[in-house]
């Protein structure tokens, strides 16, 4: 196999592993019940070692996604429903459709759907390339 094909195969395998870690944090088997993460796009940036990742996140009513961090900044745009975000060291913030939130790199945070319908957000991450997009925090 040519060197280019080997590199391409390795890159594709790494992308698949990263996708699994994003889709099922803490488990390579399935997404947590009531949570759906859909990878939309991933692109290298002009800043070496950084990439932009966009993910749609859907939480069923009453479902929470526990404390976690990201290896870069997260910008949230709420598409529908109502989220409550708990960001370490700050009071909870409630977000509805059209609201935005910025979360600094490495900041521990959690989200919960506090509404009666599925809550959906567009999450844009500016992160260190090659690191897991999400790390659970106990």
Segment roles from a protein language model:
Residues 2-56, 102, 132-138:
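A short, N-terminal "cap"/entry segment at the start of jelly-roll beta-barrel domains
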Residues 38-42, 96, 108-109:
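Short structured motifs
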Residues 42, 47, 61, 84, ...:
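Extracytoplasmic low-complexity repetitive segments enriched in small/polar residues
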Residues 50-52, 62-77:
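A short beta-loop-beta micro-motif enriched in histidine and acidic residues
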Residues 59, 89-106:
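Short acidic-glycine-tyrosine-enriched beta hairpin
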Residues 64-66, 84, 101, 105-112:
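Histidine-centered metal-chelating micro-motifs
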Residues 71-89, 99:
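Glycine- and acidic-residue-biased ligand/ion/polar-headgroup-sensing regions
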Residues 92, 107-130:
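Ligand-binding loop in jelly-roll beta-barrel domains
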């Amino acid at each position: 196999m040519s060197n280019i094909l080997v590199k391409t195969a390795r890159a594709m395998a790494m992308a698949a592993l990263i996708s699994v870690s994003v889709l099922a944090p803490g488990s390579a088997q399935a997404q947590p019940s009531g949570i759906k993460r859909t990878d939309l796009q991933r692109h290298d940036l002009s800043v070496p070692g950084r990439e932009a990742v966009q993910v749609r996140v859907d939480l069923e009513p009453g479902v929470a996604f526990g404390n976690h961090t990201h290896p870069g900044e997260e910008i949230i745009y709420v598409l529908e429903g109502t989220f409550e975000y708990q960001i370490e060291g700050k009071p909870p913030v409630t977000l509805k459709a059209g609201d935005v939130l910025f979360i600094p790199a490495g900041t521990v945070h959690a989200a919960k759907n506090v509404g009666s319908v599925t809550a959906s957000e567009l999450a844009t991450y500016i992160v260190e390339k090659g690191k897991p997009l999400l790390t659970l925090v106990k």
